[in-house]
Swiss-Prot record:
Designated gene of the protein: Max
GO cellular component: nucleus; RNA polymerase II transcription regulator complex
Origin species: Drosophila melanogaster (Fruit fly)
Biased composition (Acidic residues): 1-20, 130-147
CDD domains, sorted: bHLHzip_Max
Basic residues composition bias: residue spans: 152-161
The family this protein is said to belong to: Belongs to the MAX family.
InterPro entries cross-referenced by the UniProt entry: bHLH_dom, HLH_DNA-bd_sf
Stated name of the protein: Protein max
Length: 161
């Protein structure tokens, strides 16, 4: 029994659904047992070309994701080296930011306790401080409030330095 041309089609569909470099993630595999040696070689070459194209595209995507390499020509070794450096820098920044967040949370807790202590010890005096005259005044100078906030903000920033 002879095979038709349709039966001999070689599956070289892209491996977009699978995330495998070897092409094993594909759900369709071609049985090459009935192919000639030349057809098997052509099939193997097509698979290898697809694998190389996938690797090349992955390196291009990686190069474009690294700020110091974006738009630059770079060897694969340079791409890997700069990517590693970028990841290490990002990890360091994340760690520093997490420490800053913890410090700010700690400062917020201290300030909240101070506010609570002031409110409980000076309940009557606090109410007098916020009299209708001061709170209700439409002509309160917003710049003074902004400057006061700015000074407090600067103090907080230098507090842990």
């Amino acid at each position: 029994m002879s095979m038709s041309d349709d039966d001999r089609d070689i599956d070289i569909e892209s491996d977009e659904d699978g995330d495998s470099d070897t092409g094993l993630g594909s759900s369709r595999h071609t049985n090459t047992a009935n192919f000639t040696q030349a057809e098997k070689r052509a099939h193997h070459n097509a698979l290898e070309r697809r694998r190389r194209d996938h690797i090349k595209e992955s390196f291009t995507n990686l190069r474009e994701a690294v700020p110091t390499l974006k738009g630059e020509k770079a060897s694969r070794a340079q791409i890997l080296k700069k990517t590693t450096e970028c990841i290490q820098t990002m990890r360091r920044k994340i760690s520093e930011n997490q420490k800053d967040i913890e410090e700010i949370k700690r400062q917020n807790n201290i300030i909240a306790k101070q506010i609570q202590a002031l409110e409980s010890s000076n309940g009557d005096q606090f109410s007098e401080f916020l009299s209708d005259e001061e709170v209700g005044s439409e002509e309160a100078d917003d710049e003074d409030l902004d400057q006061d906030f700015s000074r407090r903000n600067k103090k907080m920033k230098t507090f842990h330095a």
